[in-house]
């Protein structure tokens, strides 16, 4: 986002009559963050989980279709975002499957409706469009790879073949975009080659056992991509070509760093290949140490792991999820447990402390902290809340991850 667009968001934000109170509440949170974290009440994490789920359901039911949108304080709701709708579905079904949560039934219903909508908007080529629906973009590899996560969750939950068939079409289209060197070199976001394709490969590997005839070929293609990604990793575990912009690719955001590391770790587990897990754990531990030492992460990190820009809670939640996986895989990874628990408290504080109680905003996690940071400025991106509730369910041992 350029300086002009950034200043325009500030102006639009303050034109709303009640946004001064949001601003001062946020400033108060920044000033007294240490105290908020220290005195976060018992039961607050579970409250944050329930309220986050309620907001995700609202993000689906408030619009004209049954996709999930993003809310901006300065401009309201966007059109639906197929990619994030896809990976919100597993979160809703995981919450619903115990039947214990106050919004369990509504979560299940919203997940089914979102899944049916995604089936309707799947392209003839097998992919799904990038970006928000009003942008009318072509099919995109990364976005399609996230929607097959939702298709898998629905298939496991219902056993209905329509979700499996949809995923197969999508996966075949994704592999058509992989070149001989292992890069997704066509039909990906910005037309740029990026390493966070690991987060596309991982759900394909999770699907592979359900497609016995394709399994070996898919695993070979997955290894081709993952091996290329490892060529982009430095000795200090930092990853080149990891940002979702062109002009800041030298200092990627923790959101896309976490995508890449999580994809590597899951792929390593599914393929039983240690080198991918080691690559993921290395980067995850660097960021865990920085977080524990400082109490907060920067939003971006350059090749020396020097940070800049405001904290991006989405990336924090994603890292907490990865730290949880690492801790579950290795009981000696005490650093991962400490970082995960501290991050989940921080996310709960950010999401619940302050003036946001209205239905469009209550319970949601913001794009940046403070909310006027450069990432999703004054926004409540649905993917931030999705990852927060996933991480809180891990922390609370809510149910097994699907």
Regions found by a protein language model. Give the residues of each.
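Glycan-recognition and catalytic cores of secretory/periplasmic carbohydrate-active enzymes
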Residues: 1-402
């Amino acid at each position: 986002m350029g300086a002009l667009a950034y200043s325009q968001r500030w102006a639009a934000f303050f034109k709303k009559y009640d946004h001064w109170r949001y601003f001062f509440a946020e400033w108060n949170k920044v000033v007294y963050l240490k105290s908020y974290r220290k005195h976060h009440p018992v039961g607050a994490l579970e409250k944050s989980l329930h309220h986050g789920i309620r907001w995700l359901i609202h993000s689906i039911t408030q619009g004209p279709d049954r996709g999930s949108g993003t809310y901006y304080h300065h401009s309201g709701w966007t059109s639906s975002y197929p990619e994030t709708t896809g990976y919100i579905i597993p979160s809703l079904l995981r919450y619903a499957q115990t039947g214990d949560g106050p919004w369990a039934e509504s979560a299940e219903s919203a997940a089914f409706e979102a899944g049916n909508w995604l089936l309707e908007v799947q392209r003839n080529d097998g992919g799904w469009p990038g970006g928000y629906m009003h942008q009318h973009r072509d099919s995109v590899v990364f976005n399609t790879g996230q929607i097959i996560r939702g298709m898998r969750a629905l298939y496991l939950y219902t056993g209905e073949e329509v979700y499996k068939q949809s995923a197969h079409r999508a996966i075949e289209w994704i592999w058509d975009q992989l070149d001989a060197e292992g890069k997704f070199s066509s039909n990906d976001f910005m037309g740029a080659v990026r390493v966070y394709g690991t987060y596309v490969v991982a759900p394909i590997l999770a699907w592979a056992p359900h497609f016995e005839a394709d399994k070996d070929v898919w695993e070979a293609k997955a290894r081709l991509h993952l091996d290329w990604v490892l060529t982009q990793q430095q000795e200090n575990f930092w990853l080149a070509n990891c940002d979702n912009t062109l002009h800041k690719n030298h200092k990627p955001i923790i959101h896309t760093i976490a995508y890449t590391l999580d994809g590597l770790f899951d792929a390593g587990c599914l393929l039983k290949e240690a080198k991918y897990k080691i690559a993921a754990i290395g980067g995850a531990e660097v960021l865990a140490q920085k977080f524990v030492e400082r109490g907060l992460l920067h939003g971006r990190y350059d090749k020396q792991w020097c940070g800049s820009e405001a904290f991006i809670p989405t990336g924090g939640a994603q890292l907490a999820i990865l730290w949880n996986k690492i801790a579950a895989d290795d009981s000696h990874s005490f650093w991962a447990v400490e970082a995960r628990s501290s991050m989940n408290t921080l996310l709960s504080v950010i999401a619940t402390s302050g003036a946001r109680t209205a239905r469009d905003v209550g319970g949601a996690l913001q794009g940046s902290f403070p909310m006027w940071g450069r990432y999703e400025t004054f926004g409540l991106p649905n993917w931030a809340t999705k990852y927060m509730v996933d991480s809180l369910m891990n922390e609370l041992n809510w149910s097994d991850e699907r």
